[in-house]
A protein has these predicted regions:
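Viral RNA-dependent RNA polymerase
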Residues: 1-370
């Protein structure tokens, strides 16, 4: 992570827009955070940033942040966070139904929202400078996916007819499993420090990560009511739920989580880490295949935990080219391990026919949404 952060920092600072991006994000306002549906305003937990209430209260984000703006007299994100002396990562939770089982959704406290907005806005600016990062590319990503496939196909034909070289067009399609829970704030901190950001920005970002290393989560009301009406001697059918019950502040129904970024919270920061890790992967693959007299071109698309790496592998020995595919997957898995990324091979494929990224399936210029 430190190597990836160092290389990423050097690459970003070499970009002529680096200082302009920092200035732009430091002068950003809080208005975009107001578009979020709701924020936690009161909770059944003892904190210094939220009012205590016997029942949690979620309020519309634009109303809670309006109060914060009136309190501090500024709508500048940097101005708001500089006037807060304490960052507490407090959340409420509710389950969201989806295919494959419900996903937990965390609602940030309204004061935390301004700090996360500052951090994520900065990371968004850095992501925009990296060609692999797709959260910031909008509707351009579909064109990148299709045009890359067509370009590689044309080059494959050219290599065969003009250079008498054989070529393969594989693609790694991956959706990481246990992405959010796997990361620790210590690991994030190493990466952040290695980026070499100005000390004032770095200090605040580290404070946000420190707060996230001890998140306070108010459990859903339905679960609270269930345990209120259930004897403490009665064991839960699911082992994970029983563990949660035993390790929760039972009088407040608050659980303290010591790791993980929080589902969808540090979205752009995790995407920045992923592209930095992938840059290291590309360097290792290119150096290794050069020793085997195999040429490779790669175009990678990344959005947080999703990845599509389209490749054009060319050479004169077909056996060496197929063997290199096994080596590429091995290097991919090892770099994932070194970055604490769990590779779920049920959701990872080496494809020769179809490419998929964010539910957009394509083969050449033909494509469809799932």
């Amino acid at each position: 992570m430190m190597l990836a952060g160092k290389k990423m920092g050097n690459k970003l600072r070499a970009n002529g827009n680096f200082n302009k991006t920092l200035i732009s994000k430091l002068t950003d306002n809080i208005h975009e955070a107001m578009m979020m549906t709701s924020s936690l305003e009161e909770a059944r937990m003892e904190t210094k940033t939220l009012l205590y209430s016997s029942k949690k209260k979620n309020a519309m984000s634009h109303m809670t942040l309006k109060k914060l703006i009136e309190e501090h007299g500024t709508s500048s994100v940097a101005g708001l966070v500089s006037r807060e002396n304490l960052i507490e990562a407090a959340f409420s939770m509710f389950p969201k139904s989806q295919i494959g089982g419900p996903r937990e959704i965390l609602i940030q406290s309204y004061k935390l929202r301004s700090h996360v907005r500052f951090f994520e806005s900065l990371c968004e600016g850095l992501c925009m400078m990296h060609p692999k990062e797709m959260l910031t590319k909008g509707n351009k990503k579909e064109n990148i996916q299709s045009s890359t496939s067509s370009s590689f196909k044309n080059e494959l034909i050219y290599n065969k007819e003009k250079k008498r070289m054989m070529s393969l067009m594989p693609a790694i399609v991956a959706d990481a499993s246990r992405w959010a829970p796997s990361f620790t704030m210590m690991m994030f901190s190493y990466f952040l420090i290695s980026l070499g950001l100005p000390s004032e920005i770095e200090d605040h970002c580290l404070a946000v990560l420190k707060a996230f290393s001890a998140k306070l989560i108010q459990l859903p009301d339905s679960l609270v009511e269930k345990w209120d009406n259930k004897s403490s001697l009665e064991i839960e059918a699911e082992e994970e739920l029983q563990w949660l019950r035993e390790n929760t502040m039972i009088t407040r129904f608050v659980h303290r989580v010591m790791s993980g970024m929080g589902q969808g919270m540090l979205h752009r920061f995790s995407s920045l880490i992923h592209v930095a890790k992938d840059d290291i992967l590309d360097e290792l693959i290119t150096m290794y295949l050069k020793q085997k007299n195999v040429d490779i071109k790669m175009v990678t698309m990344i959005s947080s935990d999703d990845l599509l790496k389209q490749m054009l592998i060319s050479g004169h020995n077909l056996k060496d080219m197929f063997e290199s595919l096994v080596d590429i997957l091995s290097i991919y898995e090892v770099t994932n391990m070194l970055s604490n990324i769990h590779t779920n091979w049920k959701k990872t494929s080496l494809s020769f026919n179809f490419n998929e990224f964010n539910s957009y399936f394509s083969t050449g210029k033909r494509a469809t949404m799932a």
